[in-house]
């Protein structure tokens, strides 16, 4: 069982394993096999959880194609990319909020005074968490800046593109800023804060920022960098990489066991069951229900996506009210409290040359739809 999970063993494995009579996960398995066969992804590790159990797990293809082929493995560690945002940075912010360190609707500049520059003085913590801040999608990478301090200067100098609260624009700058907020208020670097206050309570021993070089063979590589070196255990996101591998928007590495445990612990806490998840139930409910301005139709929780054009991992059957997130490298996690289910897909779709583009969008949608159908979600 995965109830209250930290690092706990899988209850069931393999295609077709299910918690309800007649459930058939063969269509899920076929979708994943076909994606590998077409070259849409080099390899994939996937899991479907339901009722506290893993009811399907799939491992297909290769975790590496270059410099030499390596078979995919359930224990492969992946660059989680933007899944860092809702799984690490947002809960870190909310832990500090639970402690009374700040309110969600206070200006960010109250805690980070330099953030007030360039018209950002009224942007709130909630607006960063929901991507309604008005800030641009990312820092400018056209100039050759390097280092955390250089990134901080650029964040503080960033000028909004539009008024806060006007429109949903997904922005890495929002979560870089939130990572800086966590560090400033807690007095800890974000990676150390996450290890101590999020990963350790959940028993996520295979997760963290800047993995040790000795773990390289267990990590799925992404693509060649500008120096023609294959990135492996080094964050793929170029902004996070320039920042040294630790940032609020990207940098987490993890594997299927740890991410499945995270998902189940969150669902358990949300439902009021026993759980190691390091936030209160009311906080989890707040994070996973719409928190954007009331008159806006792009629905965002605090860190989590609910109903926007990014919500393809919901598929065609899981309801609005389910929630999740994606990562650029080819990762996604979607959770449905109504059916007590989650769908986890881990790939390094950018390997080896940054290709394998929009096919991942269709794969996420189709796998979620097939999984929901197998679970009897209509």
Where are the predicted features?
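Short, conserved catalytic-motif segment at the N-terminal edge
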Residues: 22-80, 101-103, 150-153, 354
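N-terminal export signals
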Residues: 2-19
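Short, surface-exposed beta-strand/loop micro-motifs that present aromatic residues
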Residues: 322, 329-342
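Short, surface-exposed loop or secondary-structure junction motifs
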Residues: 57, 62-64, 118-321
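Active-site SXXK
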Residues: 32, 46, 52, 76-105, ...
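A short acidic/glycine-rich loop-to-helix N-cap element
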Residues: 350-363
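Short, glycine/proline-biased beta-turn/loop segments that scaffold the active-site neighborhood
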Residues: 103-118, 200-202
